[in-house]
């Protein structure tokens, strides 16, 4: 009996050690990432230079030392000015920004996409011949390597000359058309998609290396197709992006680390499914909680948080011959101006040696930043837990009906409008506007559901028209609030564009209803 007792005691102690081990595994060393950075998306909702400088100063005060800028068509290309759009910065503005950031100890790393996500280049006749698919325009053909190299050598050289940073981010993510056209398909079938991808990115990386810089590329495609990874220069740094999914979502990270590749990490504070009318706050808090410890434990050298203004997917207005008349982002997020709390959550996660507790962080932030009581802090936390639900073809993805979604959002609106901050009220005003924009969206969808009802007839417009007219009036007030809150943060043209994007479908519905006459 004594033997059995000792065995049971031993098993109990082993079990306790396992429990303690699991608990202590949550406490990780505060590895001082070489670069603690922010990845700023300037493709859409384009910020003013003054706003970027102010933001740079703030993140520097928080302890960040790197700012990655994805310009797309807002960069003032020297020899390829065709690419630069109507809200592009001037070269003197970029130089001023780089100099200012350096004075704060912040290094600016430029992004120059060279494979996928190049709609902003391929939309132009000057470059369209490089497309994998002329009807898509999102990706260059990797087998047109000579012509591709001539273009991107110029673009990389421009970035290298402007930016003193040792690094150039060359993109390479989400190349969904890989092996799409006949020539590439035949190559992929014979040699594999990995070699098709790596052969191209190898050439792009070597161009950057010859410029005396270190290439950084997104890791998703090389993780998905790792077979030819050894052909890629080992100087190339792989940036693993994880916005809330399980590790190794794209592929085996350890395999590429064993091959000698260095990794940087990237979490997110604005990403899918975020848009104008919903923010998945809880996913973003959990993302910082889970991914930063993972990156530390895997030995990632640097850590960044991304903030996406859009998905990077676009809708086009085409003319005959696949000529592009217009290009619009499919998804627009609320501007970065409303997300300081998530930036702070990311920074706090970098500083501490245990995973972020989202609720405790929000309560502390509410007290320190807004002067809120614990009760109001808890209410703010409740607001962030609203399910990020949208509608698909007029139907809620989870709720029973639109009215239920409106009632849920009304609770959030009521809380936010009752909260009385003692400091930094502008930040609370952004939260209020987000909730009111969701209300605008839901009421539009409710009106649209009535418009699409099986019994909607020409006489039905008389009942629906007053509600839509009221919605248009509400939209104008929301536009005014949005313009006021983002004046000086976004470029004026961007403010007008974002208001127009939100209002367009409501105004279209109004015009149709007014035109319906017996």
Each language-model region and where it sits:
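A general structural-boundary detector
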Residues: 9, 25, 39-42, 157, ...
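Amphipathic alpha-helical coiled-coil/zipper oligomerization segments
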Residues: 23, 115, 474-477
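Substrate-binding cleft of carbohydrate-active enzyme catalytic domains
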Residues: 31-219, 237, 245, 257
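A ubiquitous, low-specificity "background" feature that marks scattered single residues
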Residues: 11-12, 47, 179, 226
């Amino acid at each position: 009996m004594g033997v059995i007792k000792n065995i049971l005691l031993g098993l109990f102690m082993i079990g306790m050690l396992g429990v303690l081990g699991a608990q202590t595994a949550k406490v990780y060393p505060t590895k001082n990432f070489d670069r603690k950075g922010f990845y700023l998306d300037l493709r859409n909702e384009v910020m003013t230079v003054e706003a970027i400088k102010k933001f740079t100063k703030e993140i520097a005060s928080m302890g960040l030392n790197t700012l990655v800028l994805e310009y797309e068509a807002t960069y003032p290309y020297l020899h390829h000015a065709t690419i630069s759009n109507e809200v592009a910065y001037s070269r003197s503005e970029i130089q001023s920004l780089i100099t200012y950031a350096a004075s704060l100890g912040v290094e600016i790393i430029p992004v120059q996409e060279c494979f996928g996500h190049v709609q902003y280049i391929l939309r132009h006749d000057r470059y369209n011949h490089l497309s994998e698919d002329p009807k898509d325009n999102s990706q260059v053909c990797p087998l047109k390597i000579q012509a591709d190299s001539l273009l991107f050598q110029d673009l990389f050289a421009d970035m290298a000359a402007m930016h003193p940073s040792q690094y150039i981010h060359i993109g390479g993510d989400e190349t969904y058309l890989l092996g799409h056209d006949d020539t590439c398909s035949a190559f992929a079938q014979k040699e594999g998609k990995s070699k098709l991808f790596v052969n191209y990115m190898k050439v792009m990386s070597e161009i950057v290396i010859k410029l005396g810089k270190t290439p950084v590329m997104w890791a998703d495609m090389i993780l998905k197709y790792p077979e030819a990874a050894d052909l890629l220069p080992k100087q190339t740094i792989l940036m693993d992006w994880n916005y809330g999914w399980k590790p190794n979502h794209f592929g085996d990270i350890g395999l590429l680390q064993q091959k000698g590749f260095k990794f940087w990490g990237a979490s997110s504070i604005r990403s899918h499914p975020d848009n104008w009318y919903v923010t998945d706050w809880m996913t973003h808090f959990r993302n910082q909680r889970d991914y930063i410890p993972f990156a530390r434990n895997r030995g990632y050298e640097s850590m960044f948080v991304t903030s996406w203004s859009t998905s990077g997917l676009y809708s086009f207005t085409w003319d005959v011959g696949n000529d592009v008349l217009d290009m619009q982002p499919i998804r627009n997020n609320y501007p970065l101006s409303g997300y300081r709390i998530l930036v702070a959550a990311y920074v706090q996660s970098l500083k501490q040696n245990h995973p972020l507790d989202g609720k405790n962080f929000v309560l502390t932030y509410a007290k320190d930043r807004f002067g809120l009581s614990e009760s109001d802090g808890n209410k703010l936390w409740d607001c962030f837990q609203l399910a990020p639900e949208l509608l698909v073809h007029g139907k809620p993805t989870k709720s029973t009906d639109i009215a239920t979604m409106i009632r849920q959002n009304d609770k959030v609106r009521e809380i936010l409008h009752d909260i009385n901050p003692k400091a930094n009220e502008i930040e609370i005003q952004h939260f209020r506007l987000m909730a009111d924009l969701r209300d605008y969206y839901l009421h539009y969808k409710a009106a649209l559901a009535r418009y699409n009802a099986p019994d909607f007839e020409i006489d039905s417009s008389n009942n629906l028209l007053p509600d839509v007219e009221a919605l248009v009036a509400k939209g104008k007030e929301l536009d005014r609030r949005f313009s006021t809150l983002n004046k000086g943060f976004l470029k004026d043209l961007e403010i007008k564009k974002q208001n127009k994007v939100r209002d367009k479908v409501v105004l279209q519905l109004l015009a149709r209803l007014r035109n319906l006459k017996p």
